Every structure is written in C-alpha cells, then in structure tokens.
C-alpha cells in the first residue's frame, strides 16, 4: 500500500525522492496496462525482476520492504490491483506452496495439523508427497447427531457454458422456493449471478430476500458468497435448503489461482486434481455442514455434477448423504 512506501524518510531526502519516483512511475505503467473492467495486473518476468532488485536495494528502508524482498527472492506469487477511485495501486504477494515456507521446521519437529473438514484426505496425500510422515490421524465426531444431507441434482441440467443456463437456474430456483417454509440459502461466488438472483427474487418476495445480511425470520431467502456464509453461519439457523448454481471451482481469473495453476503446470502437475478440485471440495464441505443438523436439502443446479467425472467425485465426497430424484412440496 502507498503508506508503506512513504512513512519514514523526509520528503526532501534523495532516497525518499527515488522511492516516490519509482512508485509513481510504476503507477503510471500499471494504469496504462489496465484492460476493460479488470482490476488485477499480472506481472511479467522483467517487471518481477525490476521489483526484486528495487526492494532488495531498499530493504533497509523498512521491515515491510525487507519482508517483500525476502518473499520475492523465495518465488512468491505476486500481482498488482488497481484502485480506480483513488488512482492508486497495491502490490500483493502470497506463497504458492505454503508448506514449503515451514518445511524446514517440520522435518525435525513434531507437529499437529487441524482441519475444518470431516476427513481431509487431500491434505494427507499432500503431506505424504512432501515426505512428511503422518503418525496418527484422528477424526472427531460432531457434537450433534449427524443426519444425511439430501442431495438433489435435477436430471439433464444444463452446463454453465449454455447461453440459457442463467435463466434456467433462476426459473428452477423460483420453483424450489415457492413451497419452502424455512431458510433458503443461495450460494454463489459469481458476483453478477448473485446480484441478479437477489434482484429477481426481491421483485417477487420483497424484504424476505437478503443479500449477505443475518436473517431474522425462518422463511427468508439469503443470497451470499461462500466466504461470507462460512464466516457467519455459526450465528444463523441451519437452512432448510441450500441452492448451489455453480460448483465452487476456484476462478482462474483470481491472480493467486491463475499463478498457482501456472506454477503447477510448469512442474507437470495435475493442477486441476491437485489444486482446484481439493479447494472446491473443501469450500463445499464447510458450506454445507449445517445441513447435517436438520437433514437439510442440497440442490445443485450445475450440470457438471453429473456430466463430469470430477463432478460425480464431488457428489461422492459429501457424506453422510442421500441422493433424491425429485422434490415434493413441503417435503
């Protein structure tokens, strides 16, 4: 952030002037590269090398500059986001492989990993690939009697690339809500789809429709992103049904996801099954866990759930569960 660049030296000092000049030069360059509505700028090798040298040469300027210099030298993923309102830019860094940052500590020490998932098989495989032996795996039971989640995937459901997909899922969702007595949750990380769905339903159900707000009554309709729901579900009554229009495969439009995929591809790894699929299963698992309390319904309107092998694998990972072939009014 800008404050991390200008907080220490007097404005008149030569070092300060050099840093200010570099900041403004990069700002101009990044805004000239801006494409349509995208707020993210991917950096090429030349730009990364320039930033690496700059932060290394000025690492004594602040602890923040030193940390950035170290991160770049270790090959962290980096990208820039643009703030159109304030005409500023922010520089982001994130490790592609978090475990590699602490592996030297794990080799000679005992460690305990905690997972939010009921059974985290992907992470166990990940540790074994890194030659980190697991001595004991403990799966704790829930503090309530787990009921089977009822999974409904409409037959012959469209794929997301079908031009009629959005209209189709909106029409189906409206029918599913008509007979619902309890809370209906619509989950989507696609911002446009989430807003469109909330707007369409609000024109029918008015104030019953909420956009990422805590519901106060049983029969409300909540539209939210996965992250918002995971962070707030503890204070919300278990939904009667959760409607998922798109399986939560991480978007490669997000810089960290795109850079991780590129990194894994360069290493000839199966980037989909080793990165995107585990991330999707983990996000889905955490999002639907409240349904185990009341045997709630999970409705998946993404045709890939049946038509793709990995989609069927995601369905199989939801346990305990029971797939149903139809929905009955007030069932």
Q: Where are the language model's segments positioned?
A:
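Conserved coupling segment at the C-terminus of the helicase ATP-binding
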Residues: 1-201, 304-313, 324-331
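Short, acidic/turn-prone active-site loops that include or flank metal/cofactor-
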Residues: 137-142, 213-215, 226-227, 246-250, ...
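Generic beta-strand/beta-sheet core signal
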Residues: 114, 187-189, 212, 244-245, ...
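Conserved helicase motor
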Residues: 188-192, 208-218, 223-231
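Short, structured coil segments at secondary-structure junctions
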Residues: 107, 130, 205, 237-238, ...
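Short, surface-exposed basic-aromatic patches at helix termini and helix-loop junctions that form
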Residues: 128-129, 199-206, 216, 234-240
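Generic recognition of flexible, low-complexity loop/linker segments
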Residues: 98-103, 171-175, 211, 229-232, ...
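Conserved RecA-like P-loop NTPase helicase motor core
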Residues: 157-158, 218-309
């Amino acid at each position: 952030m800008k404050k991390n660049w200008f907080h220490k030296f007097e404005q008149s000092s030569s070092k300060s002037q050099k840093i200010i000049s570099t900041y403004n030069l990069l700002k101009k360059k990044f805004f000239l590269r801006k494409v349509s509505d995208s707020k993210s700028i991917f950096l090429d090798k030349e730009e990364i090398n320039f930033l690496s040298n700059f932060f290394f040469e000025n690492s004594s300027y602040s602890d923040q500059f030193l940390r950035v210099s170290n991160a770049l030298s270790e090959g962290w993923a980096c990208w820039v986001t643009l703030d159109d309102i304030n005409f500023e830019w922010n520089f982001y860094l994130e490790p592609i492989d978090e475990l590699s940052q602490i592996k030297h500590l794990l080799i000679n020490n005992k460690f305990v990993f905690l997972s939010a998932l009921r059974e985290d098989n992907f992470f166990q495989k990940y540790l074994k690939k890194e030659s980190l032996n697991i001595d004991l795996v403990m799966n704790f039971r829930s503090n309530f009697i787990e009921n089977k989640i009822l999974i409904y995937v409409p037959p012959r459901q469209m794929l997301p690339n079908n031009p009629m997909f959005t209209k189709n899922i909106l029409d189906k969702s409206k029918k599913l809500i008509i007979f619902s007595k309890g809370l209906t949750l619509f989950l989507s990380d696609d911002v446009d789809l989430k807003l469109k769905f909330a707007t369409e339903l609000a024109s029918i159900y008015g104030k019953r429709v909420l956009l990422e707000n805590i519901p106060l009554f049983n029969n409300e309709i909540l539209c939210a992103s996965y992250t918002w729901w995971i962070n707030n579900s503890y204070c919300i009554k278990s939904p009667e049904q959760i409607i998922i229009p798109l399986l939560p495969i991480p978007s490669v439009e997000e810089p960290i996801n795109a850079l991780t995929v590129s990194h894994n591809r360069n290493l000839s790894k199966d980037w989909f099954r080793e990165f995107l699929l585990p991330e999707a299963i983990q996000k889905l698992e955490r999002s639907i866990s409240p349904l185990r309390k009341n045997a709630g319904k999970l409705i998946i309107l993404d045709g890939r759930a049946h038509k793709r092998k990995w989609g069927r694998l995601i369905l199989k990972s939801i346990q305990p569960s029971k797939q149903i072939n139809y929905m009955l009014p007030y069932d």
